[in-house]
Structures are given as structure tokens and as C-alpha cells.
Amino acid sequence: KIDQQNEYFILVSPGDDVCLQESANMHIVTVNWPSYPLWEQIGLPLALKKIKPDLLHCTSNTAPLHCPVPLVLTLHDIIYLEKRQSSSQSWYQEMGWHYRRLVVPRILPKCKKIITVSQFERKRILEALHLQDGQLVAVYNGFNSHFHLQPKAPEITRKYIDSDNYLFFLGNTDPKKNTPRVLKAYSEYLKRSEKKLPLLIADLKEDAIDRILEEEKITDIKSSLRFPGYIANTDLAALYSGAFAFLYPSLRESFGIPMLEAMACGTPIITGNTSAMPEIAGEGALLVDPYHPEEITEKILQLENDNQFYQQQIEYGLERSKLFSWKNSAEALLKIYKGLTR
């Protein structure tokens, strides 16, 4: 929408074009290879030799080791370069970890420009990889426009939870998502709260939840948990809007799009005071030490017991989320593209 002069080719795997729309100067090209490493290292360079673009922008941390055109890379984070993944990682996640550790250090010197998603991550990357300062820039992410303040939609929320008021948490087996401490914080909340709101946990299977509850010796809270598993992206806005608060106290994030989605829907967030979360959520957000479950509990209770403070957090989130959009991101990227193709 912001550039009608240049021509763009979006290269995707089969089936990955469902959310994309072609236009006069935007073309979708399907590249068919059986696995992602082969797709990126063989299929993508072959397709580029046919298209002959002025530059390639790879948007997900890795790129072809032998790229036939000038390369721009978005490096979202370097978590996989900093530490070994935990034993809870799936086989697919483990292979992805090895692939990134192999590819990333080898392609960075070949990049004309490297983009990351926050000033926090930019600083970490510069320190860890000793890049030239001008080679690495931060361009903030945006979030989809269908996340906005809207009336409650019980016809959607009741598909996932049998309550009109609840706490909302995007669960994950990734240790950085801090699921065990969130559940410990919720256990303490149930002991101290008069309202005892249920906790809706998205995208986490019951067996994974059961393991955490048993390890933390808090199996008694299971009846207050709702775990529908996968939640369609089209339903997320309604679930944010229906939630009393959104819990996002990760141990580490390079950006944290869900925080902005919840804020834009008028839902107060509780997030971590580490990594990029204070930068994105801002100083007015409810920031906690994610390693201390009692801090998470206290913030939930503060929201519950102080309606004026609760309303202030709603207003703060609505205003804060206006600072971020994909249009802003696209304009920043276009400026980079033009600078490299003059």
C-alpha cells in the first residue's frame, strides 16, 4: 500500500500463502521443497536466479548461505546462540536450534543490513556478535488491526471458557514463557482473592499442564484452569477483550506482540521487567520480576481490588498500543530497501 513503484515477490512454501493477497506490483511465488533447510538453502536460491531481484529480505533469522543477490536479514533474537535449549524442547525445536546455530554466524557477514525488533535485542546482538554498528538497525514490529477495543463476544469466548470474566495466559512449553511460575502465582491468587477468576490457558495441552501442576505440587488448582488447546487467531481479539487481565511475565522476549494485542483490546497486562518487555510495554505498564511468582500475584490482586487503577491501566494500554503498527514497520523497511538499491 505504501509503495506502488517497486515490484515485490513473496516466496513461500506450499500452503503458506493463505493470508497473502497479490496486487499489481506484489506477486506470490510458491517454492516447493520437502523441508525448511532444503527450501531455504536450495529452493530459494534457485528461485532467486529466475526472478533476479535487486535484493532479498529474509524475515525469520536465517537465510541462504550462498545468496545470489544482496541480502537483508531480520534477526529477531539470539536466544539460540546464548544458551542450550532445555530437555522439554520437541525434536523439531531441537533441529531448528542446531540449524540456526549453524547458519546465523555464517550469513551475518554477508548481509547488507541486519534488522532486529527492539533496542534491547540490538544491544545484545552487537555485544554477542561484534557487528558494525551501522549494519544493525532496530525496526519495531506491529500487530494486526483486528485487535482493537470491542464489545464482549460471549458467542466466541464461550467456545473456550464457561465464564464471562477470567484471566488469560498464552501457555507454552518453552521455558522462557515462564508457565510454572505463572501457575504458582495463580495458585496463590486463588488463596487470597474473593473473586477467584478462572485462568484460561491457550495453546498448551492438558498433559503438559498436568506435569507442571504435579512438579509444583499445586494439582488442587486444576479445576479453576481452562485449557482448550489451540485457539484460532480470528478468535483471539474476542478472548483478549473478554479477559479481566492478560498475563505475559516471560523470562525473555525480543519484542512481545501479544502484549500490544491485549492492550489494543482494552485489557490490562502484567508483564516482565526483563529484556525488551519494559521497552515495548512502557514504564506505565504493570512490570514484575518474572522469577518471583508473588509479584505476579500482587499485581493481579491490585487490579482486582482497585477499580480506578484498573481503568487507568486500560487507558494506558490503549494509548501505548497506538505507537506500534505494521504501517510504521513497513515505512521503516522501505527506507532501508531504497537506501540499498540506489
Named regions from a protein language model:
Residues 1-342:
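Carbohydrate transferase catalytic cores enriched for Leloir-type hexosyltransferases
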